[in-house]
A protein has these predicted regions:
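Helix-to-beta-strand junctions that scaffold the AdoMet/dcAdoMet cofactor pocket
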Residues: 31
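A beta-strand edge to alpha-helix "cap/lid" segment located at domain peripheries
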Residues: 1-28, 36-135
Length: 135
């Protein structure tokens, strides 16, 4: 498997863990060091494995959490690091987010070291269900 495909598979595993609420899988995806970071939409920067994973534990245990789909993935690989940029669609909310998921190869596995997502203003109307659109 090429590095690009392996990073895209790790990225898909991240979204699958989010979608299914699988905290154990989410924990396996993140690197085991305090150099990891995460910026959830509207949140301050979180730094450190314990803080980042606690944020996901709280999000995933919420039965009313947002449902995410992702699309338009692009993988960029440079040596032992790579990132995926993609669009996250928050189901039912009419919100599209630009996301960056950064991975590092650790012991032959691609592990997440950073996630960041923020709203894309130009795509808000496009992402909204037709019943919620203003035009």
């Amino acid at each position: 498997m090429t590095d690009e495909r392996a990073i895209l598979a790790a990225n898909a595993a991240y979204y699958h863990a989010f979608k299914t609420g699988d905290f154990a899988e989410m924990s396996r995806i993140w690197a085991d060091d305090d150099g990891v970071s995460c910026i959830h939409p509207g949140w301050p920067a979180l730094v450190g494995r314990q803080v980042v994973l606690e944020s996901y534990r709280n999000i995933l245990r919420n039965p009313d959490r947002e449902r995410l789909d992702h699309r338009d993935e692009k993988a960029i690989v440079s040596g032992s690091e790579g990132r995926v940029v993609c669009v996250e669609i928050v189901s039912g909310a009419g919100v599209a987010l630009a996301a960056t998921n950064w991975f590092r190869r650790i012991d032959s596995e691609w592990r997440m070291v950073h996630h960041q997502a923020s709203p894309i203003a130009a795509m808000l109307a496009e992402a909204a269900p037709s019943s919620q659109r203003l035009n």
